[in-house]
UniProtKB/Swiss-Prot annotation:
The modification Phosphoserine is found at S116, S188. This is Syndecan-2. O-glycosylated; contains both heparan sulfate and chondroitin sulfate. Phosphorylated on serine residues. Its main location: membrane. InterPro entries: Neurexin-like (IPR003585), Syndecan (IPR001050), Syndecan/Neurexin_dom (IPR027789), Syndecan_CS (IPR030479). The keyword Lyase does not apply. It comes from Mus musculus.
C-alpha cells in the first residue's frame, strides 16, 4: 500500500512538472530561424542619435554655472535613558554641479573666500554645535560583537578539549583493564599441561 501511495505521488509530480514546462516554452523559443527580421535574434532597433553625434561634437554640451552649497550638521536631541546612549546626527548635503569648462585658480580662490565670509556672518551658531558621532574603534577586539564571538568560540573550544581528554582517559582505562593484576586469581598450573615429550618410533 505504501508503494502505491509513493508511485501515485511521483506520478502527480511528473504530470504537474510537465504541464509547467509546456506553459513556459513557446514556438518562438524552439526555432532559431524566425519568419521576420524584427523577431530574429541579434537584431536591435536602430538608434539615430548614435549616428548623428560623435564624441566632442559640442552641439549638446550645456555650460552650467557652479552652484555653491554648504553642509550643516543638525544634531538630534539624545534620549536620557541609559538604554540608548547613542546620538544620531543628520547631515544635510547638496551636490554641486561643476561646469564643463575649467576655471582659473584665481576664480576658485575668490569663491572659497566668499564661502568663508558667509560662514563668519552666520556667527558662532554653526561653530558651537557639538556633534556626537559613534566612533568605530580601530582595534578589532574592542568591538562588542567581535569580543562576544571570540568568547563564545573560546568556551566551545574549551568544552570540546575537556570532552576529548575525558574520552582519551576512558579509552586508556578500558584498554589497560586486562594488563594489570586486579586481585584476580591466576589459573592453576594444572590447567595447562605439557604434552608428553616421549617420542615413539616405529
Amino acid at each position: 500500500m505504501q508503494r502505491a501511495w509513493i508511485l501515485l505521488t511521483l506520478g502527480l509530480m511528473a504530470c504537474v512538472s510537465a504541464e509547467t514546462r509546456t506553459e513556459l516554452t513557446s514556438d518562438k523559443d524552439m526555432y532559431l530561424d524566425n519568419s521576420s527580421i524584427e523577431e530574429a535574434s541579434g537584431v536591435y532597433p536602430i538608434d539615430d542619435d548614435d549616428y548623428s553625434s560623435a564624441s566632442g561634437s559640442g552641439a549638446d554640451e550645456d555650460i552650467e554655472s557652479p552652484v555653491l552649497t554648504t553642509s550643516q550638521l543638525i544634531p538630534r536631541i539624545p534620549l536620557t535613558s541609559a538604554a540608548s546612549p547613542k546620538v544620531e546626527t543628520m547631515t544635510l548635503k547638496t551636490q554641486s554641479i561643476t561646469p564643463a569648462q575649467t576655471e582659473s585658480p584665481e576664480e576658485t580662490d575668490k569663491e572659497e573666500v566668499d564661502i568663508s565670509e558667509a560662514e563668519e556672518k552666520l556667527g558662532p551658531a554653526i561653530k558651537s554645535t557639538d556633534v556626537y558621532t559613534e566612533k568605530h574603534s580601530d582595534n578589532l577586539f574592542k568591538r562588542t560583537e567581535v569580543l562576544a564571538a571570540v568568547i563564545a568560540g573560546g568556551v566551545i573550544g574549551f568544552l570540546f578539549a575537556i570532552f576529548l581528554i575525558l574520552l582519551l582517559v576512558y579509552r586508556m582505562r578500558k584498554k589497560d583493564e586486562g594488563s594489570y593484576d586486579l586481585g584476580e586469581r591466576k589459573p592453576s598450573s594444572a590447567a595447562y599441561q605439557k604434552a608428553p615429550t616421549k617420542e615413539f618410533y616405529a
